[in-house]
């Protein structure tokens, strides 16, 4: 079975059914409880997928319930995966490898600079994830 949205690429939707996928992927999702909090704890979710597949926009990762029930701000991020995120070509400065982790670092920096505008406390941030997301958390500590 060839996925017609990515001609010639087998299984691009295997773990992300009915999800629009694109190289234009560097986006964040932010869920804020209502009423807007002041100085709320921030929880940042990093999805897994063996660093090969995944997206933060799956319904199972919807942070609105956690934000509402726990009165926290929930942030999830996309980052480049597969060869686009983790291909390393030693000696080639244009492909140093692990750029997916750099994408994550940029998202973390964005949260630090901007989360106060959403009612979040940049000094009270918890990173969490599953599988490759959990490994990413350990790499950022």
Curated annotation (Swiss-Prot):
<comment type="similarity">
    <text>Belongs to the type-B carboxylesterase/lipase family.</text>
</comment>
<keyword id="KW-0719">Serine esterase</keyword>
<dbReference type="GO" id="GO:0019695">
    <property type="term" value="P:choline metabolic process"/>
</dbReference>
<comment type="function">
    <text>Esterase with broad substrate specificity. Contributes to the inactivation of the neurotransmitter acetylcholine. Can degrade neurotoxic organophosphate esters.</text>
</comment>
<feature type="active site" description="Acyl-ester intermediate">
    <location>
        <position position="131"/>
    </location>
</feature>
<keyword id="KW-0597">Phosphoprotein</keyword>
<feature type="modified residue" description="Phosphoserine">
    <location>
        <position position="131"/>
    </location>
</feature>
<dbReference type="InterPro" id="IPR019826">
    <property type="entry name" value="Carboxylesterase_B_AS"/>
</dbReference>
<comment type="subunit">
    <text>Homotetramer; disulfide-linked. Dimer of dimers.</text>
</comment>
<dbReference type="InterPro" id="IPR019819">
    <property type="entry name" value="Carboxylesterase_B_CS"/>
</dbReference>
<dbReference type="InterPro" id="IPR029058">
    <property type="entry name" value="AB_hydrolase_fold"/>
</dbReference>
<dbReference type="GO" id="GO:0005615">
    <property type="term" value="C:extracellular space"/>
</dbReference>
<dbReference type="GO" id="GO:0006581">
    <property type="term" value="P:acetylcholine catabolic process"/>
</dbReference>
<protein>
    <recommendedName>
        <fullName>Cholinesterase</fullName>
        <ecNumber>3.1.1.8</ecNumber>
    </recommendedName>
</protein>
<keyword id="KW-0325">Glycoprotein</keyword>
<keyword id="KW-0378">Hydrolase</keyword>
<keyword id="KW-1015">Disulfide bond</keyword>
<keyword id="KW-0964">Secreted</keyword>
<dbReference type="InterPro" id="IPR000997">
    <property type="entry name" value="Cholinesterase"/>
</dbReference>
<dbReference type="GO" id="GO:0003990">
    <property type="term" value="F:acetylcholinesterase activity"/>
</dbReference>
<feature type="glycosylation site" description="N-linked (GlcNAc...) asparagine">
    <location>
        <position position="39"/>
    </location>
</feature>
<dbReference type="InterPro" id="IPR050654">
    <property type="entry name" value="AChE-related_enzymes"/>
</dbReference>
<dbReference type="Pfam" id="PF00135">
    <property type="entry name" value="COesterase"/>
</dbReference>
<dbReference type="GO" id="GO:0005886">
    <property type="term" value="C:plasma membrane"/>
</dbReference>
<feature type="binding site">
    <location>
        <begin position="49"/>
        <end position="50"/>
    </location>
    <ligand>
        <name>substrate</name>
    </ligand>
</feature>
<dbReference type="GO" id="GO:0004104">
    <property type="term" value="F:cholinesterase activity"/>
</dbReference>
<dbReference type="InterPro" id="IPR002018">
    <property type="entry name" value="CarbesteraseB"/>
</dbReference>
């Amino acid at each position: 079975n060839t996925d017609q949205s990515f001609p010639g690429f087998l299984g691009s939707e295997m773990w992300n059914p009915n999800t629009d996928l694109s190289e234009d992927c560097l986006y964040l999702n932010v869920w804020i409880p209502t009423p807007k909090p002041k100085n709320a704890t921030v929880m940042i979710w990093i999805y897994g997928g063996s660093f090969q597949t995944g997206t933060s926009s799956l319904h199972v990762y919807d942070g609105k319930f956690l934000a509402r029930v726990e009165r926290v701000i929930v942030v999830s991020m996309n980052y480049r995966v597969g060869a686009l995120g983790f291909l390393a070509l030693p000696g080639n400065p244009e492909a140093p490898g692990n750029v997916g982790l750099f994408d994550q670092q940029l998202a973390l920096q964005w949260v630090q600079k901007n989360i106060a505008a959403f009612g979040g406390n940049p000094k009270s941030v918890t990173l969490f994830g599953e599988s490759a997301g959990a490994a990413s958390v350990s790499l950022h500590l």
